[in-house]
Amino acid sequence: MTDTTQNPWEEDQAPDQAAAANHSHAAATSGEHAAAAGSSGTPAQTDPWAASSSAPAGNTPAPDNAADAWSNAPPPAASDVHQSAADWLNSTPTPTQEHFNLMDPFRHTLVPLDRWVTEGIDWLVLHFRPLFQGIRVPVDMILTSFQQLLTGLPAPVAILVFSLLAWQVSSFGMGVATLLSLVAIGAIGAWSQAMVTLALVLTALFFCVIIGLPLGIWLAHSDRAARIVRPLLDAMQTTPAFVYLIPIVMLFGIGNVPGVVVTIIFALPPIIRLTILGIRQVPADLVEAAQSFGASPRQMLFKVQLPLAMPTIMAGINQTLMLALSMVVIASMIAVGGLGQMVLRGIGRLDMGLASIGGVGIVILAIILDRLTQSLGRDARSRGNRHWYHHGPLGLLARPFIKSRA
């Protein structure tokens, strides 16, 4: 335990301290040499950046704010950023002017018919909407009457009445066929919808007869008016059924009454055309004979022309009835009820059973109406001297009274 006891860590730290001392001495020496060199006047060799400071005045670089245009610019305000973004989004591209190409003349629309039609319908709706709403009143009244009558009758009573009516206007076989057909409609569950469809069709037929017969009689006696109206009738018959729906919805709305209105417009041309044809086909010698006996124009019309033209007129009524039935089905797209609505709902739901019920009901109803109107169109001369009440169920009831009078 003498003073000669050594610290074992001193031997390890001595070399490190010596190395640190040598390093600091070398750094001091190099600093002195650098100072001496700087004072000796050789900056180009010791300071590599001195060349840039000793450059000619003409090659002096631009200031920092000129070299960097964004260094001193203030940051854009948030409102300016949003405004520029909005302007960019809302800006429309500048239209490029294209010259007319003779080899492709119809690349662009030349006649803006769609815009004209849209503006015309908007103008009609704006100025004449009360008029079109007033047209709904008589149509709604007649439709409501037919619908209440047909849907208010019990099904057995209605079937019996229709069967007797078919027997009266046609034959006993037609009465039986009508009976079986109506029973089939009720059996498949389409009776109420079939009565709604029948009410729509009868309402449209009623107005078509009221409008079409007088118009056809007038056009049959006026060649100038017939030449003016004939192109309109051609356009009405060739226009697709769906095209009628758009202006009717704009002017009248949706529902059963607009459906009847569009059906009237669609089914009107046949009765007008065939009324004109029937009256003009009356033999000229019969007309001359009536005139020679002093018949007045009214007597000529009701006693000669209309009775002889009745088969042709009834053919027009038959065509009008068939077109009305087809249009009532199409008009189900504007919320018209009946069998067409069943078909539309079945197609929309991919329910083929429901669509089939509506389709079968439409077919049966169309066959019944077609056969009945064809029977009404038979020439009165084919019945002989018998009156309409001398046959059918009314003939059975009136026969005892007729024999008693004889």
UniProtKB/Swiss-Prot annotation:
Question: GO cellular component terms?
Answer: ATP-binding cassette (ABC) transporter complex
As for membrane topology, the entry says: Multi-pass membrane protein
UniProt subcellular location: Cell inner membrane
Q: Where is the ABC transmembrane type-1 domain?
A: 194-373
Q: Which Pfam families match?
A: BPD_transp_1
List the biased-composition ranges (Low complexity).
15-42
What residue ranges are annotated as transmembrane? Answer: 149-169, 171-191, 198-218, 248-268, 320-340, 350-370
The protein's UniProt keywords, in alphabetical order, are: Amino-acid transport, Cell inner membrane, Cell membrane, Membrane, Transmembrane, Transmembrane helix, Transport
Major location (coarse): membrane
Q: Which intervals of the chain are annotated as region Disordered?
A: 1-83
Example of a GO biological process term: amino acid transport
Gene Ontology molecular functions: amine transmembrane transporter activity; carnitine transmembrane transporter activity
Effects seen without this gene: Uptake of glycine betaine and choline is completely abolished in the ousA-ousB double mutant.
Do you know what upregulates this one? Answer: Induced by increased medium osmolality. Repressed by glycine betaine.
Family per record: Belongs to the binding-protein-dependent transport system permease family.
Quaternary assembly: The complex is composed of two ATP-binding proteins (OusV), two transmembrane proteins (OusW) and a solute-binding protein (OusX).
- Stated role: Part of the OusB ABC transporter complex involved in glycine betaine and choline uptake. May also transport several other osmoprotectants such as ectoine, DMSA, DMSP, proline and carnitine. Probably responsible for the translocation of the substrate across the membrane.
The protein depicted here goes by the name: Glycine betaine/choline transport system permease protein OusW
Supply the source organism for this entry: Dickeya dadantii (strain 3937) (Erwinia chrysanthemi (strain 3937))
